[in-house]
Swiss-Prot record:
Alphabetical list of Pfam families matching this protein: RNase_HII (PF01351)
Main location (coarse class): cytoplasm
Gene that produces this protein: rnhB
GO MF annotations, alphabetized: manganese ion binding; RNA binding; RNA-DNA hybrid ribonuclease activity
Family in the record: Belongs to the RNase HII family.
Its biological purpose: Endonuclease that specifically degrades the RNA of RNA-DNA hybrids.
Residues bound to a divalent metal cation: 32-33, 124
Protein's UniProt name: Ribonuclease HII
Location of the RNase H type-2 domain: 26-215
Keyword Disulfide bond among record annotations: no
Amino acid sequence: MTAIRVPRRRASADLQGGFDFSRPDEIVCGVDEAGRGPLAGPVVAAAVILDPARPIDGLDDSKALSAKKRDALYDLIVARASAFCVASASVDEIDTLNILHATMLAMKRAVEGLSVLPTLAQIDGNRCPTLTVRAEAIVSGDALVPSISAASILAKVTRDRMLVDLHERFPVYGFNVHVGYSTPQHLAALREHGPCEVHRRSFAPVREALDLMAGSR
């Protein structure tokens, strides 16, 4: 599907919520993911239908926000959204399907898990998962479309919290600091300790660490 390139401006007031008042029957959900690039942990996706009667100020691409601001917005989204769902694809699914298809699977699960059935899913990026509702991809949608911004925040905060929890099980890797991304600290820990069960074997740095451990035996 060809991605839609939206002009760099915020959505109009009629579209700030999940309902398009120019088309009264349209219920729009925003969809985004977090965690495609890390070497460890699941990929997480969220779908959000905003309530136009309960607007949320400050929504933006989660990567442009501080952790403190993301946490505050997370609570507001959960409290005020008409519907939301957060879903994931596991490390095993990432390694079996590849990261792109696992991401599409997580997005599909998020949309299908909504308590309100949308008529349109707006997806951040240039690809759409296979859905039973209409879908459109919006390049840079997480910075442009409020419901996608909200989804990006839910996905990012949820995944970061999951990796902090994984740090309790696997403290040598520093997941609480880098949340699985390929930092010098993480790569050094991989070389020293080898991968653990939540590392993605399909990612090159993890395979290289496995080969290094095998060669040292």
